Amino acid sequence: MNAHSKILAYNSSVKFTNWREKLQTNFTNFIIDVKDVDMFGDKVGFIKAVVDLKIDGKKIPGITFIRGDSVSILTEIRTESYSYFVLVYQPRIPVGDFIYENPAGMMDESGDPAGVSIQEIEEETGIKIKKENWKFLDSVYTSPGFTDEVVHLYHVILNMTEYEVLKLNNRLTGTENELISLKVVNKKDYLRLNKTAIGLSSLYLAKV
């Protein structure tokens, strides 16, 4: 894709227009300089921008990584005797390590976080869920000094047998270019393994 096509793509993307409209609502007299755009095929992935903005004559740091909204799903499994949580274990290059986290994914252009949540659960765990099984917890910023990302948090409750839980544990999943394995854990191990702010926030908000 050439530079002109990229400009047309990011200018019309939901993530960029939403971010720009929010800036226009809350600030005046700013200039947006888009430095680079990462494309995922023909779709806009990430946008790196610098905003020239002053408030009362003081220049405000404006380096921004625009990635749009995401979803994260606290996946709880209940058997007759125990309660478990499903974590995904995968390499995360920005932190230089493999980490445990909740099933999650980026929003698409549909702007439907509930629909994306269901899709991500199926892709990352192989579990099919119904809307009545989950509830919305909250929407939170992840790193507002760097990125526009808002994560919509959901809590899903599934009923399974101990045998079904056993089959789910250590399952290899994920789509192309993903290397994901599942870990089914109790609450104590969830707190020990999941060191993401999103994971800990979800557990707190779900009050489980």
Residue positions per predicted region:
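Phosphate/diphosphate-binding loops
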Residues: 123
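N-terminal leader/linker segments that precede catalytic domains of diphosphate-processing enzymes
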Residues: 1-99, 106-119, 127-177, 183, ...
